[in-house]
Amino acid sequence: MGVHILSTGSSVPNFSVENQQFEDIIETSDHWISTRTGIKKRHLAPSSTSLTKLAAEAANDALSKASINAEDIDLIILATSTPDDLFGSASQLQAEIGATSSTAFDITAACSGFIIALVTASQFIQAGSYNKVLVVGADTMSRWIDWSDRSSCILFGDGAGAVLIGESSINSILGFKLCTDGRLNSHLQLMNSPSDSQQFGLTTVPKGRYDSIRMNGKEVYKFAVFQVPIVIKNCLNDVNISIDEVDWFILHQANIRILEAIATRLSIPLSKMITNLENYGNTSAASIPLALDEAIKEKKIQPGQVVVLAGFGAGLTWGAIVLKWQ
């Protein structure tokens, strides 16, 4: 039983912040940011724009393109690390788009979340459990940024991307590999940092509260540049496809220096990498489906082409998927 990508969709907040605007709050410049990250601007969600709203807009975009009603969806998987509700926002997304017949749950894996969610969805279809599955990668990382931290506040943007997949005799997903190394988890974290507590005799019970995102940029860079080319090569070897046979690479949009270094290690031209960093920044779980949707809109990806998706992020987690575009 095959898995076919039926459509894609995306959404970003209307409000955006350009590099020059950071000069008013931290010691930086447009030149410093753009040369080190490849980012020119990023879209940020105001208080009136929820994670669920962005995810629903991307989902409805994908459903509209496939001419499929929300009631026909069997399963919704929302990849996010920034839900509106700590218990998860997939059920809120289900209600928002009217997918009343579907099961819905969240996957939390930061910037690798979409890759893991798409693999999970494909396995449900191949097992015969579900027919149509909506996968959404969405994050509002701006909610968790320390705006005085120059190393991280310039990187992140908010957004959502969606992919609708279904059962088919044609198989779009040729292979995948997923990896985790929890020993490296301290390099990228958003930790519970209690500021209050309740005392029960001699025992203190802390009250939950999360801190801002903390990242060791040098270690994340070394990790991504070393591990991502390996997982891509291994994934391609498993399906007997060479690097030269790949038409497009869509990697998590972390920063341009990571993408350039990975391209060098894979011995591929940077022109084979689809990037949208300049306009969106690092949108975490949304970055890959957002870039995929734009590439399809721009008619870069054509039927019959081989596309590699690869994500990497907190955990530390990473993975790759090989697609044959149909």
From Swiss-Prot:
Q: Name one GO cellular component term.
A: chloroplast
Please name the top-level EC class of this enzyme. transferase
* Molecular function terms from GO: 3-oxoacyl-[acyl-carrier-protein] synthase activity; beta-ketoacyl-acyl-carrier-protein synthase III activity
One GO BP: fatty acid biosynthetic process
Report the locations given in the UniProt record: Plastid, Chloroplast
Region annotation (ACP-binding) maps to 253-257
Q: What is its main location?
A: plastid
Top-rank taxon of the source lineage equals Eukaryota
What does the record give as the active site?
111, 252, 282
| InterPro entries on file | ACP_syn_III_C, ACP_syn_III_N, FabH, Thiolase-like
> According to its UniProt record, in which pathway does this protein act?
Lipid metabolism; fatty acid biosynthesis
Plastid as a keyword of this entry, yes or no, is yes
- Please verify whether the record's keywords include Plastid: yes
Q: Keywords on this record?
A: Acyltransferase, Chloroplast, Fatty acid biosynthesis, Fatty acid metabolism, Lipid biosynthesis, Lipid metabolism, Multifunctional enzyme, Plastid, Transferase
Q: Which reaction does it catalyse?
A: malonyl-[ACP] + acetyl-CoA + H(+) = 3-oxobutanoyl-[ACP] + CO2 + CoA
Q: Known EC number(s)?
A: 2.3.1.180
Q: How does it assemble?
A: Homodimer.
Family per similarity comment: Belongs to the thiolase-like superfamily. FabH family.
Q: What is known of its domains?
A: The last Arg residue of the ACP-binding site is essential for the weak association between ACP/AcpP and FabH.
Matching NCBIfam families: fabH (TIGR00747), PRK09352.1 (NF006829)
Q: What does this protein do?
A: Catalyzes the condensation reaction of fatty acid synthesis by the addition to an acyl acceptor of two carbons from malonyl-ACP. Catalyzes the first condensation reaction which initiates fatty acid synthesis and may therefore play a role in governing the total rate of fatty acid production. Possesses both acetoacetyl-ACP synthase and acetyl transacylase activities. Its substrate specificity determines the biosynthesis of branched-chain and/or straight-chain of fatty acids.
- Entry protein name: Beta-ketoacyl-[acyl-carrier-protein] synthase III
Lineage runs: Eukaryota, Rhodophyta, Bangiophyceae, Bangiales, Bangiaceae
Which gene is annotated as encoding this protein in its UniProt record?
fabH
